[in-house]
Amino acid sequence: MDDALHALSSLTAKKRTTTYKKVAVPILDENDNTNGNGPNDIDNPPELTGNGFLFANATLNRVKNRLEGKKAPEQNHNNGKDRSENSLPTQLISNLYDGGEELEKSEVKDNSYSEKNVSSSFTQTQRIPVSIQQDKVFNVPIHSVNDGKPTQLIKEDGLVNETSQALKTPLTTGRPGATQRIDSSGATSQTQPIKSIEPQSQIITTSSNHSNALSPKIPIIPTELIGTSPLFQSIQNRGPDTQMDVPPQTAHDEDKTQAIGIPQATHQEQKTQIDTVAQTLQDEVPHTLKIREIQSELASEDSKREKARNVEYKKPQKPIPTKKFFSKESFLADFDDSSSNEDDDIKLENAHPKPVQNDDELHENKSVELNLTDETRINEKRVPLLSSYANNLKREIDSSKCITLDLDSDSDEYGDDDMDSIKLSKDESVLPISQLSKATILNLKARLSKQNQKLSQRPNKSKDPKVDHNVLLNTLRKASRKQILDHQKEVIETKGLKLEDMAKEKEIVENLLEQEILRNKRIRQKEKRREKLEENDFQLNAHDSGSDSGSESSGFALSGNEIADYESSGSENDNRRESDSEKEDDEIILKQKKSHHVKHIINESDSDTEVEAKPKEKADESLPKRIAINLGHYGDNIGEDTDKFQETNVLDTQNIEEVMAERNTIENEVKDDVYVNEEADEAIRRQLIDKEKLQLKQKEKEHEAKIKELKKRGVTNFFEMEAEESEDEWHGIGGADGEGSDDYDSDLEKMIDDYSKNNFNPHEIREMLAAENKEMDIKMINKILYDIKNGGFRNKRAKNSLELELSDDDEDDVLQQYRLKRRELMRKRRLEIGDDAKLVKNPKSSAFFESMVEDIIEYKNPFGAEEEYNLDITSTATDLDTQDNSINVGDNTGNNEQKPVDQKNKKVIISEDFVQKSLSFLKSNNYEDFETDKELSRIQHGNDEAIEDLYTLKQNSSIKSFTNSQTDSTTSKTVNTIIDLEKRPEDEDEVENGDTSLVGVFKHPSIIKSFASRTDINDKFKEGNKTVKILKSYKTVGSSKASITYMGKTRKLIAPKRKTEGSHRYHHDHHNKKMKMKTKTKSNKLFESGQDSFDN
């Protein structure tokens, strides 16, 4: 007992944890005692029993029988065996409590079955979905056997004409008190989620031993999947029913079969059940058990939770963008079709009135309409919310793209145009297409114009008023201000104060400040009046003194400039005074100060003002003292102390004023003397200016009188004619004749500075100019010294100027002489190196040194002084010391010069012709013309500073070829050419040169000859290695640095052997013959040997 009650108490808490168990349901026989529901019980669902239900359990039945005092009936084991054999698979229903599996081990032995052999075969199962969200109720009438109606008519709402069938339902009889009525709402969690299966037909065949008729197989019509079909829901008095169990129906008849098709209902997932449960007749059980109410409430709560959980979100499908093409003809055709369809519909409704129907017909039509509306609702509910929302949006978008034309609905507003349009619409079928389109267009225009007029007359309520940002800002400021004030008010009230009292005090203070400002203004006005009186008195005194001294300075004259300056200065002073007074008033108002106690020191001469001021002071004293600031009830407490404090202040201020008055009197006595003199000068100046003005006015009057007299005489006509002729002759180029007009022009005099008024000190000006010149000279000297130290002049040499800012011709000549002298000095310093210099001895470094020397040479005559560098290269057939057989070079030029060969430096000399033939590619075609031009240039310009041109440098270059002992003499060319750069004797030059008178005077020693190497070339091959000597130290030559720019790898070379006289002669003749035969060959054949090379 305790275990059973404990299982019932745990029913509500652990309802969700379910297990599933297959239980066989027996097939009942017709002969069994059945207790069906009467016709009054149509509203209640069929009562179900079986091993899978809660209250059909054996243990519960035992407990119930014991409580009621009844004995448990005997169980028939044989019937149990037959029942188990013939039982069919029933619905998979979970236990509603823990420990249900143990209780169901002892299965209840239900109602007795007949011993008839009933064979049943189920070919296929049926998917029966049940909706959770549907609130409608199916009332399945079950007719008992006692009524004589063995069949029941089942009609479902989901199917109109196909789902109703005559079913023969043999009902089973149960034991009294053994069965319980189970509320459909309590079995919400007994449903089993099963994957969706395609709706299939069910065929149930039953055979009986006592029946001779064969039962036909009736296939069930497959039904559509409808999302919200109601099935077996609760009674009206009960809560929201979500029963998902199928009403158990069995077909056990010999001649009858059942084909059941139940529509499907899904809540986001298709739920199926396979359920065949036998109907039983139950005893009357009270329906007012408390546990059933609790179960119904829990089931409704669970259903709500499942609804909230099972809501799925689906993305709205984006509309596929499609281009819509609109044309005038299609639009008009659609418009005409729509208007004609509407007219036809109206005519059909009027032509076919609705027939009068009876009450029965009305009732049947209503049921049919209800079924149709249920179907449409089901179809509508199948569509998810998001997809429907997306479809609505698409419709709105499509409608916005189209043009909507609203017709005038009011019949009273139709005019003649509308009537014409109606006539046109009637005659549209008669008119051709072209006329039809024009008519419709005109009709549309008329309608739209009327519609626009109506819209313009109506107030635009839909349009939002324009939002002004300034208004919004003002509202925000007001709101924020109000919020701040409220906050301040709360803070002040918390402190125990009141804003009203504070506002009153603030008003009082503001009123007092305004009174103070007004009082200060009055005081200032009084002071201005006094100042004006003083100025008037001062002007009268000055005028009197000026009249006395005017006679003394009558001979003193003033210019027109002084008069104009005085007038302008007077106007400026007046303007300044006015502006100062205005500024002072503004400052008083802004600063809100108290009264300024201005002290005026009155001289003895101003006795009248003192007399006027005294009665005013007395009148002020006689007036009662006005309280400037009303302190309220606090003023009485401060009164006595303030009187004492004022008395002490008055005594102190009187002492201070006496001391200040004494000082001011002494200062004023000194200033008055100066001021009187200045006043006298100004008065004299005014008088002179007035006199000058009178004189100018008199001159103008006299001039005008002269012009009037000339006009009367007729002289003006003659003058006009002359003026016209002069203008026509010169066209205004000559300008005005004669002196200028005598009229005074003040504007010009203002523009011109009058230095007579300025007092300049010439000594100060001279000192300033001298100081400026001195500074400039110091800067220039410092610059020159800096350039001398750091080589600034050397850098400026390329610009051919020292930047001394000297522009005269004489100074230019001096600069040229300076440059010449400087170059000569540099040249001498470089030539002092002499023959012992290592740079000159080394042929590789000598070229670099020569380039440095060439930087100093002036290029005045680059081609004129070549003759002194013409080298006499002769071929020696005998000893090198002999000069008899020397061949003179330069036969074309006529200047054949012979040079003695130094005995110390033994050299091999060859002729110039040989070198020219061997190096023909370096020689130009017009060589003779070039030589003649060179001679003429030498005679004309002289050879002060000669330099060789590119042609002579190439011509006088040296070529060396080294021969190995293994190579043939024919293939290898042993040509040793060297430049003879020795100085020629002056005697031979004078004898052989016929032009000594022109050239000899300007002749200078050659620069390049002094750097010629006097050593033998073969000396450096004595050791067998070609070496280069490197100097780590360097020598400065004319502020420049000498260095070695060539580095060579050491290589072993065989020095050439000195040849005899016979070999030299043979070698020379042999080469001459070869070169004569090969004059027309190409120049590149000179370098057939890879060992030939140029070397300095």
Swiss-Prot record:
Question: Which Gene Ontology terms describe the biological processes this protein takes part in?
Answer: cellular response to osmotic stress; DNA repair; DNA replication; DNA replication checkpoint signaling; maintenance of DNA repeat elements; mitotic DNA replication checkpoint signaling; mitotic G2 DNA damage checkpoint signaling; mitotic intra-S DNA damage checkpoint signaling
Please note every region of biased composition (Polar residues).
181-200, 881-898
Region annotated Disordered, chain positions: 68-90, 166-200, 294-316, 336-365, 527-620, 724-743, 881-903, 1058-1096
* Post-translational modification, as annotated: Phosphorylated by MEC1 and RAD53.
Phosphoserine modification, residue list: S144, S409, S411, S434, S605, S607, S801, S807, S911
Instruction: Alphabetically list the UniProt keywords.
Output: Coiled coil, DNA replication, Nucleus, Phosphoprotein
Q: Where is the composition biased (Low complexity)?
A: 547-560
This protein's source sits in the domain of life called Eukaryota
GO MF, one term, reads:
anaphase-promoting complex binding
Query: Where is the major localization of this protein?
Result: nucleus
Q: Which residues carry this modification: Phosphothreonine?
A: T609
- Stretches of Basic residues bias are at 591-600, 1065-1083
Q: Which residues form a coiled coil?
A: 488-542, 652-716
Localisation: Nucleus
Composition bias type Basic and acidic residues, residue spans: 68-85, 294-315, 611-620
What the protein does?
Answer: Required for normal DNA replication. Phosphorylated in response to DNA replication stress. Phosphorylation allows it to mediate the activation of RAD53.
Could you identify this protein by its name? Mediator of replication checkpoint protein 1
Q: Which organism is it from?
A: Saccharomyces cerevisiae (strain ATCC 204508 / S288c)
